[in-house]
């Protein structure tokens, strides 16, 4: 390398090596400098002694020569001289031996020092490697520390932001809590005033009805009194024959002729006032019942005498609502069809022939409808809603009669009890509530522990299907769970067979199960390769005679299973383009209706 290059021109690693060598030289020179100086002095002495030894050796050879040259010298002097030379040689020999000894020691010391220096070099290299590793670790730790400081700053800023937001939310919450308290008080006051006004209105209505009744009674009494003054011919088809049925002894065997003649005799011998009172009592008793039951709806043996036909053809496809349709139900007489959707309305349709004609709409709900049910007479319709309430309308005039509020979550199912005077509702707030329609209040609240998706009722038992995969059986009188059954999936729907001895359930594991309520055991399980439960509120239904079960699938097909064989009886498809939410089978057994998540409803029949 050229001597003209400066130190700065060398690479960094060369400069580093040079600095390390100079540093090592400074550290090690102080320790070995004195030894090296002494060693050099000893070498100089050794060289001097070597020269002296050579000189003495030369003189040793010269002495005999001088004796040979000058044999006449004095012998005594020569002996003395020889003794001195011998002593001097012995002395030099000892000094030489001592010097050789010291030289060996110094050589050994040099070897030891060299070994020690090599060990120190290795230690220094190891230390340098450790130092480099430590420096790298320090660099990494400094980088990590810098990152952590950055993250800490970010977290502190985020924490401060969250704290500010929390303080703001706390202030807002305090203000809203005050407003809520004030609004609650105002609402309570308004409810109190509203109840008082309703009571006054009811009293006024009752008074008007009483006045009308009195006027009708007075007019009727007047007309009957005028008619009683005229002679009454005895005819076999006279309506006064009803009195005979009420006053005659039922244990006595009488013929129709004897009954009629006895009625005529009693009528002729009876004063006008008694006859008038009897007729008035008859008409009065006829006007007592405010909830008449149509004769075609009375069925002492549910499902008996009904011809159920498995549907095979879509008779009518129509858009039932503006959006998703969640519920569908036939009236007890199979004449009316009710549908409920997310457009907050319940719509009534009249089924005749192969058509469904729109009859009217029931409004008043503030959110989507989740379930629908008619009472046993078909006069009232009950609907549950996502606005935390259930509502009752009269079917004849489409008027909203009752609004049942009290749940803190959306009401997913509401059903009439068999007496039609009480209602059970199940909600997403994990409670079931029992309502009395006479007093229009909630008389019982039961905490179920899980969101309730559907409800069915018997005389004294309420069965509820829940999100936690359990079916719970409640005793209405004791408000306690009689028993519960856990399935493999979340329960979406329940239904009872006509005899109310078997319970049909649908769950999110895509299985339908029939449970025998007498043995509390699963009797049958229905499934199909293409069947899939589409939502947490997919409804299923028994046929009116309990021979079939029907359910809609997520891909839009309607599946019908035979209870007798346990196999799929029919699969109806190509009409729905989205998941089927609910299915209803008409009480007459001739029609089936399915509704989907789109807006469609399909009327199915056998022909």
Swiss-Prot record:
It comes from the Eukaryota. One of its GO terms (molecular function) is identical protein binding. Residues 78-230 form a coiled coil. Residues 207-230 are annotated as: WIPI2-binding. Changing residue 299 to E: Prevents cleavage by activated CASP3. One of its GO terms (cellular component) is axoneme. One of its GO terms (biological process) is defense response to virus. Changing residue 226 to R: Impairs interaction with WIPI2. The modification Phosphoserine is found at residues 139, 269, 287. Residues 230-242 are annotated as: RB1CC1-binding. Its main location: cytoplasm. It is a peripheral membrane protein. Proteolytic cleavage by activated CASP3 leads to degradation and may regulate autophagy upon cellular stress and apoptotic stimuli. Phosphorylation at Ser-139 promotes association with the ATG12-ATG5 conjugate to form the ATG12-ATG5-ATG16L1 complex. Keywords: Autophagy, Coiled coil, Cytoplasm, Endosome, Lysosome, Membrane, Phosphoprotein, Protein transport, Repeat, Transport, WD repeat. Changing residue 209 to A: Decreased binding affinity by 9-fold with RAB33B. Decreased binding affinity by 254-fold with RAB33B and colocalization to phagophore. No change in interaction with ATG5-ATG12 complex. PANTHER family: AUTOPHAGY PROTEIN 16-LIKE (PTHR19878), AUTOPHAGY-RELATED PROTEIN 16-1 (PTHR19878:SF6). Belongs to the WD repeat ATG16 family. The WD repeats are required for non-canonical autophagy but not for canonical autophagy. The WD repeats are required for the recruitment of LRRK2 to stressed lysosomes. Plays an essential role in both canonical and non-canonical autophagy: interacts with ATG12-ATG5 to mediate the lipidation to ATG8 family proteins (MAP1LC3A, MAP1LC3B, MAP1LC3C, GABARAPL1, GABARAPL2 and GABARAP). Acts as a molecular hub, coordinating autophagy pathways via distinct domains that support either canonical or non-canonical signaling. During canonical autophagy, interacts with ATG12-ATG5 to mediate the conjugation of phosphatidylethanolamine (PE) to ATG8 proteins, to produce a membrane-bound activated form of ATG8. This is Autophagy-related protein 16-1. It comes from Homo sapiens (Human).
């Amino acid at each position: 390398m050229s001597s003209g290059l400066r130190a700065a021109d060398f690479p960094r690693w060369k400069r580093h090596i040079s600095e390390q060598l100079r540093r090592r030289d400074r550290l090690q020179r102080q320790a070995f400098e004195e030894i090296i100086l002494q060693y050099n002095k000893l070498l100089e002495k050794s060289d001097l002694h070597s020269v002296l030894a050579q000189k003495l050796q030369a003189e040793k050879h010269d002495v005999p020569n001088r004796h040979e040259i000058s044999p006449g010298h004095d012998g005594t002097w020569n002996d003395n001289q020889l003794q001195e030379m011998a002593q001097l040689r012995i002395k030099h020999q000892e000094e030489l031996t001592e010097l050789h000894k010291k030289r060996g020691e110094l050589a050994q010391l040099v070897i030891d020092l060299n070994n020690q220096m090599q060990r120190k070099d290795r230690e220094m290299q190891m230390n340098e490697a450790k130092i480099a590793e430590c420096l790298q670790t320090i660099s990494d730790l400094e980088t990590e520390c810098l990152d952590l400081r950055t993250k800490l700053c970010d977290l502190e800023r985020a924490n401060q932001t969250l704290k500010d937001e929390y303080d703001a939310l706390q202030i807002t919450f305090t203000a809203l809590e005050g407003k809520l308290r004030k609004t609650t008080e105002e609402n309570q006051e308004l409810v109190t005033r509203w109840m008082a006004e309703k009571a006054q209105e009811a009293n006024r209505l009752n008074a008007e009805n009483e006045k009308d009744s009195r006027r009708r009674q007075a007019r009727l009494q007047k007309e009957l009194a005028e008619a009683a003054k005229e002679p009454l011919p005895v005819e076999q088809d006279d309506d006064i024959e009803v009195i005979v049925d009420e006053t005659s002894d039922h244990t006595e065997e009488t013929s129709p002729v004897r009954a009629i003649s006895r009625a005529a005799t009693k009528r002729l011998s009876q004063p006008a006032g008694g006859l008038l009172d009897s007729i008035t009592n008859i008409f009065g008793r006829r006007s007592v019942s405010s909830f008449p039951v149509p004769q075609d709806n009375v069925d002492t043996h549910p499902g008996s005498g009904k011809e159920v036909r498995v549907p095979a053809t879509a008779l009518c496809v129509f858009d039932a609502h503006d959006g998703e349709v969640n519920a569908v139900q036939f009236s007890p007489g199979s004449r009316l069809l009710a549908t409920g959707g997310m457009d907050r309305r319940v719509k009534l349709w009249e089924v005749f022939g192969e058509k469904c004609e729109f009859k009217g709409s029931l409004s008043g709900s503030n959110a989507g409808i989740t379930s629908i049910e008619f009472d046993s007479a078909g006069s009232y319709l009950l609907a549950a809603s996502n606005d935390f309430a259930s509502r009752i309308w009269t079917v004849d005039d489409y008027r909203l009669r009752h609004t049942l509020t009290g749940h803190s979550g959306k009401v997913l199912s509401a059903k009439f009890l068999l007496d039609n005077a009480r209602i059970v509702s199940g909600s997403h707030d994990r409670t079931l509530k029992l309502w009395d329609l006479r007093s229009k209040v909630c008389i019982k609240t039961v905490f179920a522990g899980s969101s309730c998706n559907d409800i069915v009722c018997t005389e004294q038992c309420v069965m509820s299907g829940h999100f936690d995969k359990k079916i719970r059986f409640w005793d209405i009188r004791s408000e306690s769970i009689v028993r519960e059954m856990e399935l493999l999936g979340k329960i979406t729907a329940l239904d009872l067979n006509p005899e109310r001895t078997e319970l049909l359930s649908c769950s999110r594991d895509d299985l339908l199960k029939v449970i025998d309520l007498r043995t509390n055991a699963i009797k049958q399980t229905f499934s199909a390769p293409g069947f899939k439960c589409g939502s947490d509120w997919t409804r299923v239904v028994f046929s009116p005679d309990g021979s079939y079960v029907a359910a809609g699938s997520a891909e839009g097909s309607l599946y019908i299973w035979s209870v007798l064989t346990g196999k799929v009886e029919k699969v109806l498809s190509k009409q729905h383009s989205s998941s089927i939410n609910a299915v209803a089978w008409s009480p007459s057994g001739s029609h089936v209706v399915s509704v989907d998540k789109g807006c469609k409803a399909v009327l199915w029949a056998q022909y």
